[in-house]
């Protein structure tokens, strides 16, 4: 029996995607060659890359709107550096909502002045700041849409006359947004898209070419755009599985369909956290993440009993991040509703035993 996988990342992927990927590793396109041993410049893989990029723009509603999609290496953490290298000329504005935005701020300070427009650090990042001012003379505004560690998520995004850069690593393709509000989006694959190894960048090409510095080729967005994500050898397997996952999502009905499912999952779990007297949520209710629910036991003496119950129920990956503790249930796109119900059942069983 497959486990209920609440891992924060790498995370659960659709079963049909795993099946197709495993077949491709042995025999890709019935050519008696493995996907991971063919040339990345062969016609079969070039078709994979083109399809993956096209699916990204289709799903986000950005086709024919001046955007291009890139599949790069280095993880989303590499984008903390790369965005600033390519966009920060003098000053940038950053919203600090957690560990990942803090890391992005640290990297960006290497290239210019940083304005931290707001931060929720004062309360261990358990909320999203509101009502902050973004300086109009900044080169861009950077935010993180979802915070896996603390369980918060931006529900709206500020209107700003400057370019907006967003780290959507943990909630891209999970909800409907006007993605044309963003000039650059980046996301590590290993949450809602595929296995670790590739990073998606969706970029409006007209924001490039404005910094007064030489940019190393491997870190230069324009070079990667000119080479269609083939400047160097791409992470073939990760791109292929990401393509399969995007096809899966598209066939289901795209983002509108999966957003409805994600809302059902989050509502089910948060209702139980709020109802059950043994548990307490860690994030402010209005800013709760649909992707990552963080919570604790009010009585830590019940920890061993609860842990044994959820492990016996075939639940995986429920421990909270080491910097926060408690529990974290990550409910990415591929997690079925019945897995959330299994967790709720365990929480109710603990209540009966307590």
Model-derived regions, located:
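Conserved PLP-binding catalytic core of the aspartate aminotransferase-like
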Residues: 279-309
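Conserved active-site segment immediately N-terminal to the catalytic lysine
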Residues: 165, 179-190, 199
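Conserved N-terminal alpha-helix of the aminotransferase class I/II PLP-enzyme fold
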Residues: 32-82, 99, 107
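Active-site C-terminal subdomain of aminotransferase-like
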Residues: 14, 189-270, 284, 353-354
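PLP-dependent enzyme catalytic core of the Aspartate aminotransferase-like
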Residues: 3, 328-354
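PLP-dependent aminotransferase-like
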Residues: 76-141
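N-terminal "arm"/small-domain region of PLP-dependent enzymes with the aminotransferase-like
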Residues: 1-39
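Active-site phosphate-binding strand-loop segment of PLP-dependent enzymes
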Residues: 9, 108, 120-172
